Regions:
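Conserved C-terminal helix/tail region of periplasmic/extracytoplasmic solute-binding proteins
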Residues: 86-121
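Secondary-structure end/capping motifs
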Residues: 14-97
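Generic secondary-structure boundary/loop-capping signal
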Residues: 3, 10, 62, 67-68, ...
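A bilobed periplasmic-binding-protein/Venus flytrap-type ligand-binding module shared by bacterial periplasmic
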Residues: 2-19
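Short, structured secondary-structure boundary patches
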Residues: 10-13, 76, 118-121
Length: 121
């Protein structure tokens, strides 16, 4: 899974950096709130599933929240940005979907400054 990255167009990256920073700030504010209140998170997950046509229970949603926690802003500061992208790239090479010689190019497209700016580090 791409747990440490956002994929954006060149236009958004070059012309709307402020929006990307604000999006990341809002994303982590939401993650912090949801991780800080598991009951609220479970209820919101139940509401989302219900609104999208799935049947579940509050208890099942609470279990899902327990087993798949939200990454908080503090935890994010310890994550190596782009790590999951490299793992995906390695998989692509193993499946012959990417030439091994092109694998190093992946790192050139990872920029951690937006997250660092959003989280203040």
């Amino acid at each position: 899974p791409q747990y440490d990255s956002i994929i954006v167009s060149n236009k958004a990256y070059n012309e709307r950096r402020d929006v990307l920073v604000n999006y990341v700030k809002a994303f982590f504010q939401a993650c912090d709130a949801l991780q800080g209140d598991p009951d609220m998170a479970a209820q919101m997950l139940l509401d989302w599933y219900t609104a999208n046509g799935s049947e579940t229970t509050l208890e099942a949603c609470a279990t899902e929240i327990e087993t798949r926690p939200f990454v908080t802003s503090e935890e994010a500061k310890g994550i190596t940005i782009g790590e999951s992208v490299a793992i995906t790239g390695e998989f692509w090479v193993s499946q012959q979907l990417l030439e091994e010689s092109r694998f190093p190019e992946i790192a050139k497209h990872v920029d951690d400054t937006i997250v660092k700016e959003a989280l203040g580090f």
